[in-house]
Curated annotation (Swiss-Prot):
Coiled coil: none annotated. Belongs to the class-I aminoacyl-tRNA synthetase family. IleS type 1 subfamily. Monomer. The lineage of its organism: Bacteria, Pseudomonadati, Campylobacterota, Epsilonproteobacteria, Campylobacterales. This is Isoleucine--tRNA ligase. It catalyses: tRNA(Ile) + L-isoleucine + ATP = L-isoleucyl-tRNA(Ile) + AMP + diphosphate. A motif ('HIGH' region) lies at residues 58-68. Its cofactor is Zn(2+). It comes from the Bacteria. One of its GO terms (biological process) is isoleucyl-tRNA aminoacylation. One of its GO terms (cellular component) is cytosol. The keyword ATP-binding applies. It comes from Helicobacter pylori (strain Shi470). Zn(2+) binds at C895, C898, C910, C913.
Amino acid sequence: MKEYKDTLNLNATTFSMKGNLSVNEPKTYAKWQEQQAFKRMQARKDNHGDFTLHDGPPYANGHLHLGHALNKILKDIVVKREYFKGKKIYYTPGWDCHGLPIEQQILEQLEKEKTSLENPTLFREKCRDHAKKFLEIQKNEFLQLGVLGDFDDPYKTMDFKFEASIYRALVEVAKKGLLKERHKPIYWSYACESALAEAEVEYKMKKSPSIFVAFGLKKESLEKLKVKKASLVIWTTTPWTLYANVAIALKKDAIYALTQKGYLVAKALHEKLAALGVVDSEIVHEFNANDLEYLKALNPLNQRNSLITLGEHVGLEDGTGAVHTAPGHGEEDYYLGLKYNLEVLMSVDEKGCYDEGIIHNQLLDESYLGEHVFKAQKRIIEQLGDSLLLEQEIEHSYPHCWRTHKPVIYRATTQWFILMDEPFIQNDGSQKTLREVALDAIEKVEFVPNSGKNRLKIMIENRPDWCLSRQRKWGVPLAFFIDKRTNKPCFESEVLEHTAKLFEERGCDVWWEYSVKDLLPPNYQDNATYYEKVMHILDVWFDSGSTFKAVLEDYQGEKGQSPSDVVLEGSDQHRGWFQSSLLIGCILNNQAPFKKVITHGFIVDEKGEKMSKSKGNVVSLDKLLKTHGSDVVRLWVAFNDYQNDLRVSQTFFTQTEQHYKKFRNTLKFLLANFSDMDLKNLERSHNFSPLDHFILESLETISAGVNSAFEEHDFVKGLNVLMAFVTNELSGIYLDACKDSLYCDSKNNEKRQAIQMVLLATASKLCYFLAPILTHTIEEVLAHSQVLRIFLQAKDVFDLKDISVSEKLHLKEFKKPENFEAVLALRSAFNEELDRLKKEGVIKNSLECAIEVGEKALCENLVEELLMVSFVGIAREKLSETPAFTLFKAPFYKCPRCWRFKSELENAPCKRCEQVLKER
């Protein structure tokens, strides 16, 4: 038998079944860097247009986790897909280098070293070194994911030129009249001792006291109402703000009920409050809220006046319908205060402790001085005495600092804001507010998924003014001078441009290093004593939000086009980078800086829970790469519905590895079986069989499906189409049917050569579709197949292009076999009968069979190939009978070479094999 085995076309390929990815990938990625693969990609011009993906910057702090991998791999797949389509691609990775997390790292480091660093320049130098260190670490970790981009010249928000660009964007905001300094309540992180923008706040559950407090009406107010006693009942979960109460807001036109015991609440809520025991149940009088406006009550905590007002924000779903109002500690309170000219009381310091203002304004007694507001709440509640009607504890959603994860407070301070509702001049000469321009711009942007559009619209519709200033050191300074003569900022072009040039040449450290005189242009230096520096820094969201200007516009197209074609980030960036970029783009250019927004979900564990070290459910990216390799991680990303949260566990990666092996083993089979092709056969036409036409038509159909899905960035849909084809039509039908010809026909057999061309075309399509995802693996495929490289005119993966199968194979059309579906139905019924006969021990395999088919119109050759029987239509010993067909024992002997029962003599080759042996 051995001599016959040696005569078969059992071709081998050097492409291994085992990828050994964790060992081989780093070598490939190092080679790509050495050969400057991305520059080569950018140099290829196929005249199919340009494509720019603008990178939202990760933070230059810490190592990468699986969330980073998800984001960067998705971006890489999108960019490579456009590249393989023939577009000139632009992708400049970048890093967000300023901000609080790095400051905290340095402060912790200094604390461990038991040293302090008051010099801001030296402190900033340490921050810069920290960012540089982790930027390089993350850069190398991204490269190990197979991600390609302009990593030789990435953008860094701490580069001098970049800092100058950020500042110039700020200058444009100021020149358009949208930058104002205001004293108003904003989110304040006492843990960071800094203001926060809305994007820097996350909501988590928190337990808070829930109290109902009676504010007794003053004597003159009682007289106006013609009642002897009446107290408005308020409800609050922030008792610490009661010291700053100056008003109570009611709902306009609502009816308020006065109970027998003298408590005044919204009638719509009376029954609920009576059930709780807050007020008594008997109503003795009713008043319209409008008749209560401008009456006065007394704050039971400090006996100060509290004006009764009407507020649009007052609801009748919860509480009492009477809202405690402290303009120093709430945005809605603040705007109501503007309407009623209310006093803004705010006596809480940067650390969240009561300051001396409580004594000067007689708001609280001095025992509260220096006490943290949350700690003081218990005493404040006790101090209310009989005015406290009910105390409970509730758990509710409460704003927390996104960096320290500690609760934040609302605190009125003087900060710099971008105004959302101030009209400014547009490019066409009209005037619109930033909110209006942004909402208009959103309508012109495509969102994937589409729900992202409405999400961003709602956020823009409801967002407050953007608080830009931060009381920190590591960032781009809000580099303006205040003219002490007018107490207004100096927005003179000469001064602003001089500052920008200094930043560009020497970095913005000069704002701390240089005196006012040295920072001013020569024409202003004689009056330096009249100016003082603003010492706040910019919100880091302004840094990252202006990256489109610094990367795309300032380089005048060298690094891509603005607006960019795509931005792609996690869904949390609707309130972060998407929003800050949109607002700055609308100020600078009256349009969004992107054409399409793609968002992905978050990484969660297999139960759908958020990953955390405390839960012990964190999956290590480094461990995944060492266990499976980056191509498997990349395939896992692509094989998931990234628009939702991605569940991850070792089980999911094991499943992905099976998908990877299926693709790899299929490619290995294809490579092996066209490896002995005569290269002359690549250019000539072939006589393709009905079965060849079937698989080629299937290939064309699924190619359209995969392309359509990938165009919509629906990679999981496209991969499922591809995997179904590989598993069902290709492996399950075609390859099985072709093995006899591939292994046993002569090498120059026309049928076999036609099959090889089909395999070659199929491998080409698989490579094209998988290259953006499994780039290393497809690089490996091409390296191990000269035939495929010549067929595709590609020396490596970066030369890949899509092919037209019909053109490559010189076919005008694909002719699907007649009655093919009937043959497949016959095959299915045959396999069921075959399994029964095998179980009964009647036969061992299908080659022992001959078949007689009831439907005479079916092509006998096709039936023989697809059913893998030895004969069709020659009867001998009947094995079984069904309505559709009859099975017989094959009438001849088993060929020792091809194993088909076609030999006329025992232990002798069949006629076909005999002829092949003669030709050898």
